[in-house]
Protein backbone atom coordinates (compact mmCIF):
# COMPACT_ATOMS: atom_id res chain seq x y z
CA UNK A 1 0.00 0.00 0.00
CA UNK A 2 2.77 2.43 0.74
CA UNK A 3 4.43 1.60 -2.50
CA UNK A 4 1.20 2.09 -4.36
CA UNK A 5 0.64 5.40 -2.72
CA UNK A 6 4.17 6.43 -3.66
CA UNK A 7 3.61 5.41 -7.26
CA UNK A 8 0.40 7.38 -7.32
CA UNK A 9 2.16 10.44 -5.88
CA UNK A 10 4.92 10.17 -8.45
CA UNK A 11 2.39 10.01 -11.28
CA UNK A 12 0.60 13.18 -10.07
CA UNK A 13 1.33 16.31 -12.14
CA UNK A 14 3.75 18.87 -10.78
CA UNK A 15 1.27 21.72 -11.42
CA UNK A 16 -2.15 20.53 -10.29
CA UNK A 17 -3.78 23.73 -11.62
CA UNK A 18 -3.17 22.60 -15.20
CA UNK A 19 -5.90 19.95 -15.00
CA UNK A 20 -8.39 22.39 -13.54
CA UNK A 21 -10.37 24.63 -15.91
CA UNK A 22 -9.60 27.71 -13.84
CA UNK A 23 -5.85 27.14 -14.09
CA UNK A 24 -5.86 26.64 -17.87
CA UNK A 25 -8.01 29.76 -18.31
CA UNK A 26 -5.56 31.79 -16.25
CA UNK A 27 -2.63 30.60 -18.36
CA UNK A 28 -4.44 31.43 -21.60
CA UNK A 29 -5.27 34.88 -20.26
CA UNK A 30 -1.63 35.43 -19.41
CA UNK A 31 -0.49 34.54 -22.93
CA UNK A 32 -3.28 36.61 -24.46
CA UNK A 33 -2.42 39.59 -22.27
CA UNK A 34 1.23 39.37 -23.25
CA UNK A 35 0.28 39.25 -26.92
CA UNK A 36 -1.97 42.30 -26.54
CA UNK A 37 0.76 44.20 -24.72
CA UNK A 38 3.20 43.41 -27.50
CA UNK A 39 0.75 44.49 -30.20
CA UNK A 40 -0.08 47.64 -28.25
CA UNK A 41 3.60 48.51 -27.98
CA UNK A 42 3.99 47.92 -31.72
CA UNK A 43 1.01 50.16 -32.50
CA UNK A 44 2.39 52.80 -30.16
CA UNK A 45 5.76 52.64 -31.93
CA UNK A 46 4.12 53.02 -35.34
CA UNK A 47 2.08 55.98 -34.15
CA UNK A 48 5.15 57.60 -32.63
CA UNK A 49 7.03 57.06 -35.88
CA UNK A 50 4.22 58.72 -37.83
CA UNK A 51 4.27 61.73 -35.53
CA UNK A 52 8.05 61.95 -35.81
CA UNK A 53 7.80 62.02 -39.59
CA UNK A 54 5.13 64.71 -39.39
CA UNK A 55 7.28 66.95 -37.17
CA UNK A 56 10.31 66.32 -39.36
CA UNK A 57 8.40 67.27 -42.51
CA UNK A 58 7.11 70.42 -40.83
CA UNK A 59 10.61 71.43 -39.72
CA UNK A 60 12.02 70.82 -43.21
CA UNK A 61 9.29 72.89 -44.86
CA UNK A 62 9.80 75.76 -42.41
CA UNK A 63 13.55 75.79 -42.99
CA UNK A 64 13.08 75.58 -46.76
CA UNK A 65 10.63 78.48 -46.82
CA UNK A 66 12.88 80.77 -44.78
CA UNK A 67 16.03 79.91 -46.70
CA UNK A 68 14.39 80.15 -50.12
CA UNK A 69 12.76 83.49 -49.38
CA UNK A 70 16.06 84.96 -48.19
CA UNK A 71 18.28 83.70 -51.02
CA UNK A 72 15.83 84.36 -53.85
CA UNK A 73 15.31 87.92 -52.57
CA UNK A 74 19.06 88.48 -52.50
CA UNK A 75 19.41 87.20 -56.07
CA UNK A 76 16.67 89.51 -57.34
CA UNK A 77 18.19 92.52 -55.57
CA UNK A 78 21.63 91.65 -56.98
CA UNK A 79 20.29 91.52 -60.53
CA UNK A 80 18.34 94.77 -60.21
CA UNK A 81 20.92 96.82 -58.32
CA UNK A 82 24.05 95.79 -60.23
CA UNK A 83 25.34 98.62 -62.41
CA UNK A 84 26.85 97.67 -65.75
CA UNK A 85 29.46 99.91 -67.36
CA UNK A 86 28.34 100.65 -70.91
CA UNK A 87 31.82 101.75 -72.01
CA UNK A 88 33.48 98.52 -70.82
CA UNK A 89 33.72 95.34 -72.84
CA UNK A 90 32.94 92.47 -70.45
CA UNK A 91 34.51 89.02 -70.97
CA UNK A 92 32.49 86.82 -73.33
CA UNK A 93 29.89 84.76 -71.51
CA UNK A 94 30.12 86.62 -68.19
CA UNK A 95 26.81 88.44 -68.50
CA UNK A 96 25.13 85.31 -69.90
CA UNK A 97 26.40 83.22 -66.98
CA UNK A 98 25.29 85.87 -64.48
CA UNK A 99 21.80 86.11 -65.97
CA UNK A 100 21.37 82.31 -66.25
CA UNK A 101 22.63 81.65 -62.71
CA UNK A 102 20.35 84.30 -61.23
CA UNK A 103 17.31 83.00 -63.12
CA UNK A 104 17.91 79.36 -62.15
CA UNK A 105 18.58 80.36 -58.54
CA UNK A 106 15.31 82.29 -58.28
CA UNK A 107 13.35 79.51 -60.02
CA UNK A 108 14.73 76.78 -57.72
CA UNK A 109 14.02 78.72 -54.55
CA UNK A 110 10.57 79.79 -55.72
CA UNK A 111 9.69 76.13 -56.34
CA UNK A 112 10.80 75.20 -52.83
CA UNK A 113 8.87 78.17 -51.45
CA UNK A 114 5.74 77.15 -53.36
CA UNK A 115 5.86 73.58 -52.00
CA UNK A 116 6.37 74.89 -48.47
CA UNK A 117 3.52 77.38 -48.81
CA UNK A 118 1.12 74.72 -50.09
CA UNK A 119 1.92 71.90 -47.64
CA UNK A 120 2.84 73.70 -44.45
CA UNK A 121 -0.68 74.94 -43.50
CA UNK A 122 -2.16 71.41 -43.72
CA UNK A 123 0.65 69.93 -41.62
CA UNK A 124 0.39 72.74 -39.07
CA UNK A 125 -3.37 72.20 -38.77
CA UNK A 126 -2.92 68.49 -37.98
CA UNK A 127 0.01 69.00 -35.61
CA UNK A 128 -2.01 71.43 -33.49
CA UNK A 129 -4.74 68.83 -32.86
CA UNK A 130 -4.12 67.04 -29.55
CA UNK A 131 -5.21 63.64 -30.78
CA UNK A 132 -2.87 60.75 -31.46
CA UNK A 133 -5.03 59.34 -34.25
CA UNK A 134 -5.13 62.63 -36.19
CA UNK A 135 -1.67 62.04 -37.65
CA UNK A 136 -3.21 60.05 -40.50
CA UNK A 137 -5.09 63.16 -41.65
CA UNK A 138 -1.87 64.91 -42.63
CA UNK A 139 -0.73 64.70 -46.30
CA UNK A 140 2.96 64.54 -45.41
CA UNK A 141 3.17 60.77 -45.98
CA UNK A 142 1.60 60.88 -49.42
CA UNK A 143 3.53 63.99 -50.51
CA UNK A 144 6.80 62.90 -48.92
CA UNK A 145 8.67 63.17 -52.24
CA UNK A 146 7.71 66.82 -52.68
CA UNK A 147 8.88 67.62 -49.17
CA UNK A 148 12.27 66.01 -49.82
CA UNK A 149 12.51 67.71 -53.23
CA UNK A 150 11.85 71.13 -51.73
CA UNK A 151 14.36 70.43 -48.96
CA UNK A 152 17.03 69.38 -51.46
CA UNK A 153 16.40 72.32 -53.78
CA UNK A 154 16.55 74.84 -50.95
CA UNK A 155 19.53 73.51 -49.00
CA UNK A 156 21.71 71.67 -51.52
CA UNK A 157 21.20 72.98 -55.05
CA UNK A 158 20.10 76.45 -53.94
CA UNK A 159 23.15 76.90 -51.71
CA UNK A 160 25.63 76.01 -54.47
CA UNK A 161 23.83 78.32 -56.92
CA UNK A 162 24.02 81.08 -54.34
CA UNK A 163 27.79 80.62 -54.01
CA UNK A 164 28.13 80.81 -57.79
CA UNK A 165 25.95 83.93 -57.76
CA UNK A 166 28.29 85.64 -55.29
CA UNK A 167 31.29 84.89 -57.51
CA UNK A 168 29.56 86.18 -60.66
CA UNK A 169 28.39 89.35 -58.90
CA UNK A 170 31.98 90.00 -57.89
CA UNK A 171 33.17 89.65 -61.47
CA UNK A 172 30.42 91.84 -62.94
CA UNK A 173 30.90 94.51 -60.28
CA UNK A 174 34.68 94.72 -59.99
CA UNK A 175 36.04 93.88 -63.45
CA UNK A 176 35.36 97.34 -64.99
CA UNK A 177 37.24 99.13 -62.18
CA UNK A 178 40.67 100.18 -63.41
CA UNK A 179 40.39 98.20 -66.65
CA UNK A 180 42.70 99.35 -69.51
CA UNK A 181 41.02 101.53 -72.11
CA UNK A 182 41.46 99.67 -75.41
CA UNK A 183 38.69 101.40 -77.32
CA UNK A 184 39.84 103.32 -80.42
CA UNK A 185 39.39 107.08 -80.61
CA UNK A 186 36.14 108.18 -82.26
CA UNK A 187 36.38 109.26 -85.89
CA UNK A 188 35.09 112.79 -86.50
CA UNK A 189 33.52 113.40 -89.94
CA UNK A 190 35.23 115.92 -92.18
CA UNK A 191 32.08 118.00 -92.39
CA UNK A 192 32.27 118.70 -88.65
CA UNK A 193 35.99 119.69 -88.66
CA UNK A 194 36.29 123.49 -88.30
CA UNK A 195 38.46 125.20 -90.92
CA UNK A 196 41.98 126.03 -89.80
CA UNK A 197 43.89 128.92 -91.40
CA UNK A 198 47.68 128.79 -91.29
CA UNK A 199 49.82 131.64 -92.49
CA UNK A 200 52.23 130.91 -95.33
CA UNK A 201 55.14 132.43 -93.50
CA UNK A 202 54.67 130.07 -90.55
CA UNK A 203 54.26 127.06 -92.81
CA UNK A 204 57.36 127.98 -94.83
CA UNK A 205 59.46 128.26 -91.71
CA UNK A 206 58.67 124.64 -90.71
CA UNK A 207 61.01 122.04 -92.10
CA UNK A 208 59.58 118.65 -93.25
CA UNK A 209 61.22 116.81 -90.37
CA UNK A 210 59.83 119.16 -87.73
CA UNK A 211 56.39 119.02 -89.31
CA UNK A 212 56.38 115.21 -89.26
CA UNK A 213 57.50 115.21 -85.62
CA UNK A 214 54.75 117.65 -84.71
CA UNK A 215 52.11 115.55 -86.39
CA UNK A 216 53.27 112.24 -84.93
CA UNK A 217 53.74 113.41 -81.34
CA UNK A 218 50.59 112.91 -79.28
CA UNK A 219 50.04 113.34 -75.57
CA UNK A 220 50.47 110.01 -73.72
CA UNK A 221 47.31 108.32 -72.45
CA UNK A 222 46.91 108.48 -68.74
CA UNK A 223 46.63 105.16 -66.95
CA UNK A 224 43.39 104.42 -65.12
CA UNK A 225 43.42 105.38 -61.45
CA UNK A 226 45.26 102.99 -59.09
CA UNK A 227 46.65 100.90 -61.97
CA UNK A 228 50.28 100.29 -62.81
CA UNK A 229 51.06 101.43 -66.35
CA UNK A 230 51.75 98.49 -68.65
CA UNK A 231 49.79 95.92 -66.61
CA UNK A 232 47.05 93.94 -68.37
CA UNK A 233 44.62 93.83 -65.41
CA UNK A 234 43.39 96.45 -63.02
CA UNK A 235 42.51 96.30 -59.32
CA UNK A 236 38.94 95.26 -60.17
CA UNK A 237 40.17 92.09 -61.87
CA UNK A 238 42.37 91.34 -58.87
CA UNK A 239 39.41 91.82 -56.49
CA UNK A 240 37.26 89.45 -58.57
CA UNK A 241 40.04 86.85 -58.59
CA UNK A 242 40.39 87.18 -54.81
CA UNK A 243 36.67 86.57 -54.27
CA UNK A 244 36.80 83.55 -56.59
CA UNK A 245 39.86 82.13 -54.84
CA UNK A 246 38.08 82.44 -51.49
CA UNK A 247 34.76 81.03 -52.66
CA UNK A 248 36.15 77.89 -54.36
CA UNK A 249 37.52 76.30 -51.15
CA UNK A 250 34.36 77.41 -49.32
CA UNK A 251 32.29 75.49 -51.88
CA UNK A 252 34.49 72.43 -51.45
CA UNK A 253 34.06 72.63 -47.67
CA UNK A 254 30.29 72.86 -48.15
CA UNK A 255 30.30 69.76 -50.34
CA UNK A 256 32.47 67.80 -47.91
CA UNK A 257 30.23 68.76 -44.98
CA UNK A 258 27.06 67.82 -46.88
CA UNK A 259 28.45 64.40 -47.82
CA UNK A 260 29.71 63.74 -44.29
CA UNK A 261 26.43 64.88 -42.73
CA UNK A 262 24.20 62.71 -44.91
CA UNK A 263 26.54 59.75 -44.52
CA UNK A 264 26.42 60.09 -40.72
CA UNK A 265 22.64 60.47 -40.84
CA UNK A 266 22.24 57.31 -42.91
CA UNK A 267 24.57 55.42 -40.56
CA UNK A 268 22.54 56.60 -37.55
CA UNK A 269 19.27 55.47 -39.14
CA UNK A 270 20.80 52.11 -40.06
CA UNK A 271 21.94 51.54 -36.47
CA UNK A 272 18.50 52.43 -35.15
CA UNK A 273 16.83 49.97 -37.54
CA UNK A 274 19.28 47.25 -36.52
CA UNK A 275 18.47 47.82 -32.86
CA UNK A 276 14.73 47.64 -33.56
CA UNK A 277 15.14 44.41 -35.53
CA UNK A 278 17.22 42.88 -32.74
CA UNK A 279 14.55 43.85 -30.18
CA UNK A 280 11.82 42.32 -32.33
CA UNK A 281 13.78 39.11 -32.73
CA UNK A 282 14.31 38.97 -28.95
CA UNK A 283 10.59 39.42 -28.31
CA UNK A 284 9.80 36.75 -30.87
CA UNK A 285 12.16 34.34 -29.13
CA UNK A 286 10.55 35.04 -25.76
CA UNK A 287 7.07 34.41 -27.18
CA UNK A 288 8.19 31.16 -28.77
CA UNK A 289 9.77 30.06 -25.48
CA UNK A 290 6.50 30.72 -23.64
Curated annotation (Swiss-Prot):
It comes from the Eukaryota. Oligomerizes in homomeric and heteromeric ORAI complexes. Native CRAC channels most likely consist of hexameric ORAI heteromers, implying that diverse ORAI1, ORAI2 and ORAI3 subunit combinations with distinct biophysical properties can operate in a cell-type specific way. ARC channels are heteropentamers consisting of three ORAI1 and two ORAI3 subunits. Interacts with STIM1; this regulates channel activity. Interacts with CRACR2A/EFCAB4B. One of its GO terms (biological process) is store-operated calcium entry. InterPro entries: CRAC_channel, Orai_sf. The chain crosses the membrane at residues 63-82, 95-115, 157-177, 239-259. Residues 1-21 are annotated as: Disordered. It comes from Rattus norvegicus. It is found in: Cell membrane. GO terms for cellular component: membrane; plasma membrane. Pore-forming subunit of two major inward rectifying Ca(2+) channels at the plasma membrane: Ca(2+) release-activated Ca(2+) (CRAC) channels and arachidonate-regulated Ca(2+)-selective (ARC) channels. Assembles with ORAI1 and ORAI2 to form hexameric CRAC channels that mediate Ca(2+) influx upon depletion of endoplasmic reticulum Ca(2+) store and channel activation by Ca(2+) sensor STIM1, a process known as store-operated Ca(2+) entry (SOCE). Various pore subunit combinations may account for distinct CRAC channel spatiotemporal and cell-type specific dynamics. The keyword Transmembrane helix applies. The modification Phosphoserine is found at residues 42, 45. Its main location: membrane. The keyword Nucleotidyltransferase does not apply. It catalyses: Ca(2+)(in) = Ca(2+)(out). This is Protein orai-3. It is a multi-pass membrane protein. The record marks 81 as: Confers selective permeability to Ca(2+) ions.
